[in-house]
Regions:
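Amphipathic, interaction-prone secondary-structure segments
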Residues: 35-68
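Charged interaction scaffolds used for protein-protein
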Residues: 3-19, 57, 61, 68-88
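Negatively charged, low-complexity tracts enriched in Asp/Glu with abundant Ser/Thr
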Residues: 2-47
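Intrinsically disordered, low-complexity segments enriched in small/polar residues
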Residues: 22-24, 50, 82, 113
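Intrinsically disordered, low-complexity regulatory segments
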Residues: 1-11, 105-123
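Helix-rich interaction surfaces within compact, conserved domain-sized segments
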Residues: 71-118
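Generic secondary-structure transition motif, activating predominantly at the C-termini of alpha-helices
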Residues: 13, 37-41, 52, 101, ...
Length: 123
């Protein structure tokens, strides 16, 4: 499989409630991530690039270029990293784009169409 880059996400078949975050559009999400993750969180000081956003919730898909699991969906809580809970914001990691498409976007799309709330799975 080729290396994931932000451009890798431009032409995937996005399904509601997810949408693509254009290059340069994600800096606000990246700032939010830096403000919310504290020491002990797996994404603390990680290089993270926002590539997708869930429009009906506070979920953002980040590309983590140098990580073994290069994709992470972060559910923002609007809490400060200073609050010190390394379990928040809730984060689900994915091993590949195919993994996120199957377990993330496709599952979220099915819940969205049914009007179901998504299930939070810790990973």
């Amino acid at each position: 499989m080729s290396e994931l880059t932000p451009e890798s996400f431009e032409h995937i078949p996005w399904q509601a409630p997810w949408r693509y975050v254009r290059i340069g559009e994600g800096t606000g999400y990246e700032s939010d991530l830096a403000a919310e993750v504290g020491k002990g969180h797996p994404l603390h000081e990680a290089r993270a690039i926002a590539v997708g956003v869930r429009v009906d919730q506070d979920d953002v898909l980040f590309l983590i270029p140098d990580a073994p699991k290069p994709l992470a969906v972060v559910h923002f809580t609007r809490a400060s990293a200073a609050e010190g809970n390394s379990k928040f914001p809730h984060t689900t990691f994915y091993s590949s784009l195919d993994d996120w498409l199957r377990r993330g976007m496709v599952a979220d799309h099915a819940h969205y169409l049914k009007g179901d709330a998504p299930e939070n799975e810790d990973e």
